[in-house]
């Protein structure tokens, strides 16, 4: 795998305001779904190209941010490799029921990046 960007996620302080803005700015299809963890996740379908999602920012006081995800073949190995290269693991490998696995790293410069392994 060439490790493409496969998903982008908006963690926002105001989901309704963000949905209103982006649905008017772009021709995105927004679809709410309930996560197994009890929060609403809005899927963003863009037609061709990389889609994404949005959810309520869960870190108190944190600003709204866009978080890109890169596809990997082995999420455990990629997360460990990132750590060995100086990254901080913000969220260790976690299963997203029915979809795949993710981890979130902070690179040595302070930039956040998600790693994603889809279920086959």
PLM features: residue spans?
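Intrinsic, low-complexity N-terminal interaction/targeting segments
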Residues: 41, 55-56
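Short, charged/polar, Gly/Pro-enriched secondary-structure boundary elements
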Residues: 48-53, 109-113
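Vicinal oxygen chelate
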Residues: 3-4, 10, 31-34, 43, ...
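Core segments of cupin and vicinal oxygen chelate
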Residues: 2, 9-49, 84
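Short amphipathic alpha-helices within nucleic acid-binding modules
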Residues: 18, 76-81
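Short, structured motif recognition centered on aromatic/hydrophobic residues
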Residues: 5-7, 54, 64-69, 113
């Amino acid at each position: 795998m060439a490790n493409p960007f496969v998903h982008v996620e908006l963690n926002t302080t105001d989901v309704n305001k963000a949905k209103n803005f982006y649905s008017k700015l772009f021709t995105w299809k927004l679809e709410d779904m309930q996560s197994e963890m009890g929060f609403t996740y809005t899927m963003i379908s863009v037609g061709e190209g990389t889609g994404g999602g949005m959810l309520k920012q869960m870190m108190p006081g944190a600003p709204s941010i866009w978080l890109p995800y890169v596809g990997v073949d082995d999420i455990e190995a990629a997360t460990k490799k990132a750590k060995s290269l100086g990254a901080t693991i913000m969220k260790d490998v976690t299963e997203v029921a029915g979809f795949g696995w993710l981890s979130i790293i902070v690179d040595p410069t302070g930039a956040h990046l998600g790693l994603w392994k889809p279920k086959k």
